[in-house]
A protein has these predicted regions:
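N-terminal accessory/targeting segments that precede structured cores
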Residues: 1-121, 130, 145-177, 183, ...
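Helix-rich C-lobe and terminal helical cap/extension of kinase-like folds
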Residues: 30-32, 36, 63, 178-180, ...
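Short, amphipathic alpha-helical segments that act as regulatory/interfacial helices
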Residues: 50-54, 155-158, 200-203, 391, ...
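ATP-dependent phospho-/nucleotidyl transfer catalytic cores
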Residues: 69, 76-83, 95, 144, ...
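A short beta-turn/loop motif at secondary-structure boundaries
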Residues: 111-117, 218-222, 406
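Glycine-rich ATP phosphate-binding loop
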Residues: 124, 132-140
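Conserved beta3 strand of the Hanks-type protein kinase catalytic N-lobe
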Residues: 125-126, 275
Length: 453
């Protein structure tokens, strides 16, 4: 009851803030500033409410279809880092789960955690027989009980939001579905048996890639609440300065990252949902460096027809085919069937023309002679026209964003940021080239990652 009272007190405070903001009917820069202030308060509230709400906030940071950009940006800053819990509790969980104490299982076990997150913390250890260094991920105590209370309250909040909150422009929000999806993701993430299986599947997909390293799992020392994996240290991928000092090629690392992610999404249909810098590193003990993936708690599968839709979308963008792009969006479940296709294709045509103009800008002597302000004004005019067309279609609410696609789009955005940090010129679209056209009638495009790389 005490927990529920705390949750509803926080909900009431946030709802009152939203009510006051809407009552002011602010526009332009004032509205953006007010949204940022409200979003910062929301972020602090989620941190106060603890693990469940921190994870919910991280999941909501992918929902560009239902939340303002200012809120998305603030929620994206949510981190897993929280104070660690005492080592004695971790040791007790290990004994309960594995049936033996750490002194029986390991030659050494570091009491001070290597890292602590909202759902678990990680300790370094050494195996007795082989002497191999491992990391032991131990789940926080009573997490499932906390989830049950929190998610029950969140479902009620979602029910109220569906009835009181107006729908977003051009897309329909279903807070109940968002709450249910978030709950499923959370329960799956705290099942370490699921994470172990995901890590093994991911490693199998990349077994021929020498430039990609996935830490191996020790199933005999793992359970639903304990996960033991190979210890593979590395340089954080966002630490460009240290990577340069150690002689690594940022272009090579960026290529490894983009190619590996295209492999996941376009070829295997099994992808890492959270490739942020904390889950990626460069193995500085490997000649030339190799990319290390960590944390396989949030993974998604993609059905073959949806995967093909995504591949077709990429090709239709490069080949400037708006009708095919809309077909691909329908196959992906992003564009609703039966909407005003003429209006949507007109928007797609404008977007693709803008993309093609960007591709051609490097060879466009006239555009290269434009001042920075003229280029900025040209881009602003293109965006304004697209925005007007989108506004005209909002009554149909043609777009929807299935949860797995929000993960894909967020992941590509994260990878784009990492890549630009390593090599600002890597994603310059003026240098991009279209992938080779597949043979006529070919339904699959298995060489896509190579073509886009």
């Amino acid at each position: 009851m005490k927990r529920s009272c705390l949750i509803w007190g926080c909900v009431a405070g946030q709802a009152w803030g939203v009510f006051l903001l809407r009552r002011q009917r602010l526009r332009g820069a004032k509205k953006v500033a007010a949204n940022r202030k409200l979003a910062a308060n929301l972020r602090d509230t989620l941190i106060l409410l603890g693990p469940t709400f921190i994870k919910i906030g991280q999941l909501l940071s992918t929902r560009v279809d239902v939340l303002p950009p200012e809120v998305i940006q603030e929620l994206a800053r949510l981190q897993n880092e929280v104070p660690s819990f005492p080592a004695e509790r971790a040791i007790a969980v290990i004994r309960q789960e594995l049936g033996k104490g750490v002194d029986e299982l390991f030659a050494s076990f570091e009491r001070t955690p290597l890292a602590a997150a909202s759902l678990a913390q990680v300790h370094r250890a050494t195996l007795k027989e082989s002497g191999e260094e491992v990391v032991v991920k131990v789940q926080r105590e009573n997490l499932l009980d906390l989830f049950r209370v929190d998610l029950a309250n969140i479902r009620v909040v979602a029910w109220l939001a569906d009835r009181l909150d107006p729908q977003t422009e051009a897309a329909s929000a279903n807070w109940k579905d968002i709450a249910e999806t978030s709950g499923r993701v959370l329960y799956r993430e705290v099942d370490f048996n699921h994470e172990r299986a995901s890590a093994e599947s991911f490693a199998e997909n990349f077994k021929t890639f020498k430039a990609i390293k996935i830490p191996s799992v020790h199933p005999e020392l793992s359970s639903s609440k304990v996960l033991t994996m190979e210890y593979v240290p590395g340089v954080k991928i966002s630490n460009a300065e240290q990577l340069a000092e150690e002689g690594f090629d940022p272009v090579h690392i960026s290529n490894q990252l983009t190619t590996s992610y295209l492999e996941q999404v376009c070829r295997h249909g099994f992808f890492h949902c959270d490739p942020h810098p904390g889950n990626l590193a460069v193995d500085n003990g490997y000649p030339g460096g190799r990319l290390i993936y960590y944390d396989f708690g949030m993974m998604e599968n993609m059905e073959d027809n949806i995967k093909k839709g995504f591949v077709d979308l990429i090709f239709s963008i490069y080949e400037n085919l708006p009708s095919e792009a809309c077909d691909a969006l329908e196959a992906m479940g992003v564009l609703r069937r039966g909407v005003d296709r003429q209006s949507i294709e007109r928007i797609a045509r404008d977007l693709l023309n803008t993309f093609q103009q960007t591709l051609a800008s490097a060879d466009n002597k006239w555009e290269n002679q434009m001042t920075a302000e003229e280029k900025k004004e040209s881009r602003r005019a293109r965006r304004a026209k697209i925005g007007q067309d989108l506004f005209a279609t909002q009554s149909d609410k043609p777009f929807r964003f299935p949860p797995k696609w929000t993960f894909v789009f967020r992941a590509f955005s994260t990878i784009d940021g990492i890549g630009k940090g390593l090599n600002p010129g890597l994603y310059d679209l003026s240098c991009a080239t279209a992938p080779p056209r597949p043979p006529p009638g070919r339904s699959a495009r298995p060489a896509l990652p190579d073509g886009l790389h």
